[in-house]
């Protein structure tokens, strides 16, 4: 991992990052107010800035210095960039609500809170034909419970709009490029394209929030999943194709399809570093993979031993 501060036109000849640094646009590369991070000489750069205050051109350093940095953009090894715009105040403060790509196209990300979605659902319930049974606050709560990762603020992406296109400035679409709906628990329910056609649908286990039990692409059959008591998938059911069963043992997972073909995955490591180190395929062949102490792939051996 490299952490670099802007303000320098070039890196020394032979430096690992010299070519990647030189591909950055000058306004990024020469700005001492930006920090950049990368974990590869192939990129991308993660551009770290701040959204609270933009320094003036005459400022040597922002005053006061920000106590932390946030992701404000990306730059790849060809100099193409993505720039993120964040909300400065309100319920969405700090959230990304705008993106500009390397071609100059500007996109608006419409975010909603759990309270907004709950109010919309209750209003829709009152105006529906079944208004005798309005949606209760308990059925669609205004807040979401915390998760193992911390508090859930309930903020979700609801739509993506194209706001500016330099190539076609007068031909902007009158509908969002994509639209998303959610369950009362904040789970992704459906995805719609720019023609308002539903292209994805998801179903969840009511007893286990966030556990997807089915999903479907438009025009395709619904895929369903069964879980064991520990939350692991034990069966994947496809009514129009191959289904799979999963058997979990110590350091191995056996996968059997609906044609009774079997593969065995041998694993090593624990928690986030568990990796598949050997795969026994249905035809009897074996492939192997090697990893370093950080869990990064270092070698692969095919079925012929190469």
What are these regions (language model features)?
Residues 1-306:
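Extended charged/polar low-complexity repeat regions
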